[in-house]
């Protein structure tokens, strides 16, 4: 599944964080260690998820309510054993 064509849904309060600088600042501020577990609520298209999985965090758990986005997240990150 591709995320293209999926628009943010007001009922979920969705917006897409795309600014690479802001995403990097979030991960940097978290100061993640190898044994940390991260819970990401509302990963959307996975922009932050991607950076979290590139960090030293042990695991990244993501909860997405929009069923239209779940398969895309699984397709994109499902092979990573830390996701």
Where are these regions (language model features)?
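Catalytic cores of RNA-modifying enzymes
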Residues: 1-83
């Amino acid at each position: 599944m591709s995320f293209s064509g999926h628009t943010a849904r007001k009922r979920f309060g969705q917006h897409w964080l795309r600014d690479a600088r802001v995403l990097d600042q979030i991960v940097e501020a978290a100061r993640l260690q190898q044994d940390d577990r991260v819970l990401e609520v509302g990963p959307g298209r996975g922009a932050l998820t991607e950076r979290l999985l590139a960090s030293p965090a042990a695991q990244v758990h993501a909860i997405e309510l929009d069923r239209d986005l779940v398969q895309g997240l699984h397709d994109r990150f499902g092979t990573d054993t830390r996701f």
